[in-house]
């Protein structure tokens, strides 16, 4: 199976995407090319195989769409742009902010935004606890960033404009029993959703949290 067919079939398996995924497919493939080009010198991701990138990065990022509310999205610890760039490609009407502390990875994100032509993405290089945003944030998402408690402690200020409305989504593999037990009471878990990534057997869970200041 070639890359285009693999990706196209995977996109078709995600109901939240439009029936015509051809344009999205071509842009995601271009994104994979950029990652491969930069990966040799910048070590953006340990996943080197393009086929694995489709499943473990692109489709893994896009299955969160039904649980994400826009238009204001923040991707904390974005790394090579997951899930923020695939989400921004699929939802061009949303405004996505990528937060990344690593200078080399942030440089890649800026280049990817430029080459992919993504005016709905902004890149913030720095530690998330130091980042200040003027616009309203609807969803803050993290993937392989840290524990639930640390993610929330460092990111909670991003919801200061409307903490009742903003939701935090942590993308996890196995059900995070221990991390849930360690969460402070101000971080209210609203739901935990098991999600299926097309072509991936590994377990995936989304933890949806609301910040409730004392």
UniProtKB/Swiss-Prot annotation:
HAMAP family: 16SrRNA_methyltr_G. It is found in: Cytoplasm. This is Ribosomal RNA small subunit methyltransferase G. The keyword S-adenosyl-L-methionine applies. InterPro entries: rRNA_ssu_MeTfrase_G, SAM-dependent_MTases_sf. The keyword S-adenosyl-L-methionine applies. One of its GO terms (molecular function) is rRNA (guanine-N7-)-methyltransferase activity. Coiled coil: none annotated. Pfam families: GidB (PF02527). CDD domains: AdoMet_MTases. Belongs to the methyltransferase superfamily. RNA methyltransferase RsmG family. Its EC number is 2.1.1.170. Gene3D superfamilies: Vaccinia Virus protein VP39. S-adenosyl-L-methionine binds at residues 77, 82, 128-129, 143.
């Amino acid at each position: 199976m070639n890359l285009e067919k693999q990706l196209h079939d995977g996109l078709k398996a995600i109901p939240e995407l439009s029936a015509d995924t051809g344009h999205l497919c071509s842009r995601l493939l271009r994104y994979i090319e950029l990652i491969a080009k930069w990966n040799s010198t910048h070590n953006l991701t340990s996943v080197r195989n393009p086929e694995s990138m489709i499943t473990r990065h692109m489709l893994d990022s896009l299955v969160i769409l039904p649980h994400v509310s826009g238009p204001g999205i923040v991707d904390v610890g974005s790394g090579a742009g997951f899930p923020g760039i695939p989400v921004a490609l699929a939802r061009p009407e949303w405004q996505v902010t990528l937060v990344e502390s690593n200078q080399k990875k942030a440089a890649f994100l800026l280049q990817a935004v430029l080459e992919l032509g993504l005016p709905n993405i902004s890149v913030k290089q720095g530690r998330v606890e130091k980042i200040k945003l003027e616009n309203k944030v609807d969803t803050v998402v993290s993937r392989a960033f840290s524990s639930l408690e640390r993610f929330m402690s460092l990111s909670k200020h991003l919801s200061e404009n409307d903490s009742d409305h903003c939701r935090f989504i942590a993308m996890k593999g196995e059900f995070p029993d221990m991390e849930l037990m360690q969460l402070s009471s101000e971080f209210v878990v609203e739901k935990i959703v098991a999600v299926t990534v097309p072509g991936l057997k590994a377990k995936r869970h989304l933890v949806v949290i609301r910040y409730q200041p004392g």
